[in-house]
Amino acid sequence: MTRTLAEILLFTSLAINAALLLFLASVLRMVMNDMNESEFKQFVVSLVHHSKKSPFMLTVLNIPFLGAIPYFYFYRFANRWLLAGLTLWLVAGALGKTMKLRIYRAVEIGDATRLKQARRKLNAGNMIQAILNSLAVVLALVPFVR
């Protein structure tokens, strides 16, 4: 595999991640906002449960990390833009996970008041992660357009 092909594949995986998170932060956010508290709670618990077991989600969300390991082993850190994009993607994922895991736990045990707060925090967390992932894609795109 050539270095360019490896970079294209890593870029594509970052773009798919960003697209998935933009969908969650925009379309799914509106769907969740249309739900009452009990529907929201049931939906989020079900979504998290099925996402953790989905081969598609596990694959799509982990390909950039798994692909970066052999890329950096073979090609080192020559492409600093790709490195910056992957680093931002990793930071966004870690931030998103730490923010949202607490929210998911609060949703599971939450009353109506806490669910409203959890919904706002979840919306904000998804939006922040989607924006950061989109910026990661832009960073990784720079070498292809120069």
Predicted regions and their residues:
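Short amphipathic, positively biased membrane-proximal segments
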Residues: 1, 31-34, 127-134, 139-140
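Interfacial loop at the N-terminal end of multi-pass membrane proteins
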Residues: 3-62, 108-120
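Hydrophobic residues within membrane-embedded alpha-helical segments of Major Facilitator Superfamily
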Residues: 9, 13-16, 88, 95-96, ...
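Core segments of transmembrane alpha-helices
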Residues: 57-70, 129-138
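Juxtamembrane helix-break-helix junctions at the cytosolic face
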Residues: 68-80
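Short alpha-helical packing/oligomerization segments
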Residues: 77-102
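Interfacial loop-to-transmembrane junctions
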Residues: 102-132
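Juxtamembrane boundary at the C-terminal end of a transmembrane helix
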Residues: 140-146
